[in-house]
């Protein structure tokens, strides 16, 4: 709830910093991350909006806003953010992973597979990309290949299924 968020000591401290200096980009970004980690996506997006307004080339903030928008179901806006992050930093593994999730949620399975493949080339142990690619492969008709990716991802992180369910992906 909004009240428990306001009582969170980290959020309180960051909010005080932002009140003292509304352009404290690092406090805005950090508070956005905390909001996102607590499932307060609208508040996270607002803080990432402010971070990006101050620093339009902040690829981390663009990626985090992409991810938060994806989980919140704002898929077109999310895709724009991920594309911009990747334009500014090609092969940015976090943005490839996030864009894979956008494409998976929007039903663009071939694009999702391409993004997850690219992310896994950079970091072969990226569980979210492995699991996402498995789901995308299954939805694209490659049931056995998909099942293998999913099994490997679950072996690396048994919580991956719950994590994706929390993103609205089953």
Sequence positions of predicted segments:
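Alpha-helical tetratricopeptide repeat
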Residues: 1-170
């Amino acid at each position: 709830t909004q009240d428990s968020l306001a009582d969170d000591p980290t959020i309180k401290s960051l909010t005080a910093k932002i009140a003292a200096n509304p352009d404290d980009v690092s406090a805005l970004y950090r508070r956005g991350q905390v909001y996102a980690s607590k499932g307060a996506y609208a508040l996270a997006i607002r803080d990432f909006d402010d971070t990006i307004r101050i620093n339009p080339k902040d690829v981390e903030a663009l990626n985090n806003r992409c991810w938060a928008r994806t989980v919140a179901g704002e898929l077109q806006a999310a895709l724009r953010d991920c594309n911009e992050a990747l334009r500014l930093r090609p092969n940015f593994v976090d943005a490839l992973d996030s864009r894979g999730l956008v494409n998976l949620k929007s039903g663009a399975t071939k694009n999702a597979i391409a993004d997850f493949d690219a992310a896994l080339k950079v970091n072969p142990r990226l569980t979210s990309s492995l699991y996402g690619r498995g789901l995308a492969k299954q939805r694209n008709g490659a049931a056995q290949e998909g099942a293998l990716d999913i099994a490997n991802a679950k072996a690396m992180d048994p919580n991956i299924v719950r994590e994706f369910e929390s993103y609205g992906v089953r």
